[in-house]
Amino acid sequence: MTTMKRLLGLLLISALFASCSSTSIINSWKDPNSNDNPDKWDKVLVAVQSPSDLKRRVAEDEVAAMSEVLFASYTVFPDKSVVQNEEALRRKIQQGEYDAIMTMRLIDQSKQTSYVPGSYTGGYWGYHSGYWGGYYNPGYYRQDSYYAIETQVFSLEENKLVWSGITSTVNPSKIDRAIREVALMTFRQMQKDGFIHPTR
């Protein structure tokens, strides 16, 4: 089985997972002029941009664990100073013989307050609670946290961006679960866009 196609096994999981997921795709784009074939890639470097080195490592490990063709960038660039040195960065990537780089970064974070209306128990009769003994659950205000993450894929053969997508995650409880949701939804969207294809 070839390279990126090994990721397609995750799509069955994501299809089952999507109904209860707090992550959704906002938009995506595929380069219509690219001639590189992601289905034949053998090595893809995963680079998560984060001010926290610990969060970067946790996130990259979570994504890299999904396929043997994915590799965490911190294992190649443990020192951030190397990433800031373009020449050293290019040399490291060439030595590793990578086909592509997939980057992930937080591009927006916001909070929204909404009102959740109250409800009556007992159906129709609940509205006449004083007489029929129904029960009223009062409404309340709820604050939700939204995180938008941008994922970009760069072809090293063509030296350009070939796919990008943005996801929105609501009220993530744990970083590893959130990044797993983002990755699954992202791979699923790649298939929808025709960027990667099912094994024939």
Predicted regions and their residues:
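Short, Lys/Arg-enriched N-terminal segments with co-localized hydrophobic residues
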Residues: M1-T3
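C-terminal motif of bacterial Sec signal peptides marking the signal peptidase cleavage site
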Residues: L16-S19
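Sec-dependent signal peptide recognition
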Residues: K5-L10
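N-terminal segment of the mature soluble domain
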Residues: D42-K111
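Surface-exposed short loop/turn segments
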Residues: E86-V153, E157
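C-terminal/domain-edge helix-coil "capping" segments
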Residues: S21-W41, P51, P138-R200
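Short, low-complexity, polar/charged sequence segments that are solvent-exposed and flexible
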Residues: V63-E68, Y120-W125, V170-S173, A183-T186
